[in-house]
Amino acid sequence: MLRRQFHSGCVQLARTRYTKPKPKNTETRAKEQIRLPTQQTHHSNELRIQPPIPPSTKNIVVPDDHPLWQFFSDKKFMRRPEDLDTTSRAWSIPELRRKSFEDLHSLWYTCLKERNILARENHLLKNAAKNNRNDYEDISEKIRTTMWRIRHVLSERDWAFKRARETFAQNKELQDNLVDDFKKEFLELDSSEDEQAFEMLTRFQEALFGIHEVIEDNVVDRKFVDGLKLVATLKLQRFQSRNDSINAILEESDGQINDVGEAFVVFTADNNLKAVEEACDAIKELRQGENGVSRFDELPTVRGYLKRLVSATTV
């Protein structure tokens, strides 16, 4: 009976690292002209060991505008407790209510900077000086009281704004009165005050219609589209008396812009006479080609306009 076995010849045919034995070097020749080691070949005599430089603050130069100076008071390592203002008090809520948003913003960051300075000094006092005095912590607590009161006042204003906006959205008569009052004030400003007038218009369009200067932040709805038409109309009326072309555009449309495509052209134009005049030339071409936008297509059309505008600005 035959048995299946591995062939024994594979071991003999296996390839080793060297297919041929390496020849032995029988002739070892002695090297001639051997250079003896010298001092020049190992190191240079020009190197000298210098004494170590002791660490000192004189060797470190810090520019005066370095950001970390904000954690120091008058560039002092640490103020003495006698130098601290221990007689001051925290701001009261009635006092903060009389301040503007800019004042509250500045006061908040002033308090934040002072608390950072006090926190560093208190850390040095407790860890480096091994002192348990609470002078720095007491002043920091006063400042913290001012900061939470600032947040309280801002929260009051935010809730008041939200409630006023809800009430305003439900009262059509109140909206019309506000628009009429703003329109009168906006158009009565002198031509030398164009910059101030358009700053007013920017705040007005954001507060009433949610139209933001940042394109990506806008939500296109019916209120947005109606606001777009009103803002374009006010923009043209601002320059109506200064240019015949602008006046003709308004007269053709009964004194206001009703097409959202025309409104978008005026809205995206710069706030100056030349840019608005060029926008009116574009409106003439739209009217000649009868390229109007129906009311049913206004929302998707404006969304497409904004999407293309965002793509153009990001390129």
UniProtKB/Swiss-Prot annotation:
Primary localisation category: mitochondrion
One cellular component term from this protein's GO annotations in UniProt: mitochondrial large ribosomal subunit
Pfam families linked to this entry: MRP-L47
Name of the featured protein: Large ribosomal subunit protein uL29m
Record-linked InterPro entries: MRP-L47_sf, Ribosomal_uL29_mit
The organism of origin for this protein: Candida glabrata (strain ATCC 2001 / BCRC 20586 / JCM 3761 / NBRC 0622 / NRRL Y-65 / CBS 138)
GO-annotated biological processes: mitochondrial translation
Family: Belongs to the universal ribosomal protein uL29 family.
UniProt KW keywords: Mitochondrion, Ribonucleoprotein, Ribosomal protein, Transit peptide
GO molecular function: structural constituent of ribosome
Intracellular or extracellular location(s): Mitochondrion
PANTHER family: LARGE RIBOSOMAL SUBUNIT PROTEIN UL29M, RIBOSOMAL PROTEIN L47, MITOCHONDRIAL-RELATED
Assembly, per entry: Component of the mitochondrial large ribosomal subunit. Mature mitochondrial ribosomes consist of a small (37S) and a large (54S) subunit. The 37S subunit contains at least 33 different proteins and 1 molecule of RNA (15S). The 54S subunit contains at least 45 different proteins and 1 molecule of RNA (21S).
